Amino acid sequence: DNLPEESLWRDVCRAHARIDAKREEILPTTELELLTAEERSQVEALPDTFVDKFVAWGKSRGDAAWQYFEAGGFTILSAMLSGVVKLPTSFGTMTPNLWFMILADTTLTRKSTAMDMAMDMVLEIDPDCVLATDGSLEGLLQALAGRPTKPGIFWRDEFSGLLEMIKKKDYLAGMVETLTKLYDGKYQKRVLRKEVIEIRDPVLIMFCGGIRSRILGQIDMENITSGFIPRFIFIEAESDIAMYRPIGPMTTAQDDVRKDLMAQLIRLREHYTSQMTIHIGDQEVQTNKTFEASLTSEAWDRYNKFEQQMVNFGVESGTPEIYTPTLDRLSKSTLKAAVLLAASQTTSKVEVDLPTMLQAIKYAESWAPFSLDVVANAGKTGSEKQLDIIYKTIQRSTEGVLRSRVMQNYHLTAREADWILQTLDQRGLIRRVKDGKTERLFATYVRS
């Protein structure tokens, strides 16, 4: 065009700025910085929590994703403590029961292995704590009705099957709503033809897992807006062949660490298992003593700042109707986690101080991206799933992927490939570069 090179460079810079703006709009960061650099250093200098020790032991035992042991460690503490430790708040009394959902892509992440290792410890301490691994709604309610104030774990390795049955089976109708209320410890009364089931002071813990694509395929927007899905803390991990380890014998060091962990759990049980006498009329009744947790003023201030930060992120996102309740509920789960960490120290009183609150927020920092990923990808159609698969293939390669290779690997016709690549291109997710008779595909956003 006989224009100077400076004009061409200005056009290139403007085009680059437009692409950057589109990437920021479509791909907002989910890495929430919830701690300052000073707070992060303070947390790193603190002694290891029970969860940290459990994660370290789990990593030494095999190649299961370490994130899964984090979920297992908190589930153990919740099973041990949520029946006797309560946190009085201005909104009511909070029970530190946590729900975890472990999502995996393949067997290399060892989802079931990590869950089994945690539950083996729980069952050694309390063989009766597992309510069920499957069953009807009535069966679950009957099990809870017989154990008021006692924690009960619903442990299911493949939760996608239950979600599918809830949608299809009439006898499971209303199960999602009932589980949501049980999480909050609400009184439930179910009137059946032959009996009446009354549940008082339930303490329900859910420890579930599943293949990520199957779980997301079964979740719909109603599950999110009703509050059922946001009550879960989601843990995700991807397969890493570099972490693969062949099976071998247990070493003495590994066994000793497990014994130390079990000894700590036994001390927890002994510390928090005590009876007290209450008077009902002229009668004296023995019941388990309840320990009231509290937060220092500094811990309350830091928690409220953290909760406000989470809610603001949800409100300012592109879809506040799903992100806001999800992050708000995750904030409450973080408060429960802080109570569990404080109670695990077996001091004379359960008090959450500022360092303990910072430890809990550090865990939440890793949980938040998983929750956001789940609600953002819930209920995707088959075509959207195909777009995701192909985009991730392109994203994994820093040198680009040939269009012909994508068509061969995913058995695409020319028309199907045109539709998929045009869609990804117009969404600002990929860049297409001519390469001979075909084209090379690059992701505009590459995982670090």
Report the location of each language-model feature.
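N-terminal helical hairpins
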Residues: 7
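Phosphate-handling catalytic cores of nucleic-acid transaction enzymes
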Residues: 10-448
